[in-house]
């Protein structure tokens, strides 16, 4: 059994940021459970591009709003608290963050 809090992660090597986003990586590959789990916060007013080549990513937006764009098809999806998206095809995508977003993924 693994039990952690975000306070346990804060300020460690599992607390990663890149200017406009911050990811608290609660479960990682070295935990040997076959998946990862993160709490990610993205700053309002930012635009970020992401691409996960080696894993499927499920994202549940618990706070905030913005726009998700599939960069391969141009398809756009409005996001708000309660939205979920699944990147099961390793899609390159962009997140435009209108209100600060907090995601569990």
Give each language-model segment a name.
Residues 34-36, 55, 100:
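A structure-centric signal for secondary-structure junctions around beta-strands
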Residues 11-13, 23, 37, 65, ...:
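Short, acidic/polar N-cap/turn motifs at the starts of alpha helices
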Residues 21-23, 36-53, 89:
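Conserved short histidine dyad/triad with adjacent acidic residue
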Residues 1-35:
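A short, N-terminal "cap"/entry segment at the start of jelly-roll beta-barrel domains
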Residues 37-41, 58, 76-78, 84-86, ...:
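Conserved hydrophobic/aromatic beta-strand scaffold that supports enzyme active sites
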Residues 47, 52-53, 58-81, 91:
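A short beta-strand-loop-beta hairpin characteristic of the jelly-roll/cupin
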Residues 27, 43, 62, 80, ...:
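Residue-level detector of conserved, well-ordered beta-strand and adjacent loop positions
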Residues 80-83, 89-105:
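Ligand-binding loop in jelly-roll beta-barrel domains
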């Amino acid at each position: 059994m693994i039990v952690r809090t975000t306070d346990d992660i804060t300020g460690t090597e599992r607390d990663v940021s890149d200017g406009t986003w911050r990811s608290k990586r609660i479960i990682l590959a070295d935990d040997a459970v076959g998946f990862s789990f993160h709490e990610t916060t993205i700053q309002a007013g930012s635009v970020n591009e992401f691409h996960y080549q080696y894993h499927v990513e499920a994202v549940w937006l618990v706070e905030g709003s913005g726009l998700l764009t599939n960069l391969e098809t141009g398809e756009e999806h409005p996001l708000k608290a309660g939205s979920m998206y699944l990147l099961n095809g390793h899609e390159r995508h962009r997140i435009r963050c209108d209100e600060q977003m907090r995601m569990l993924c």
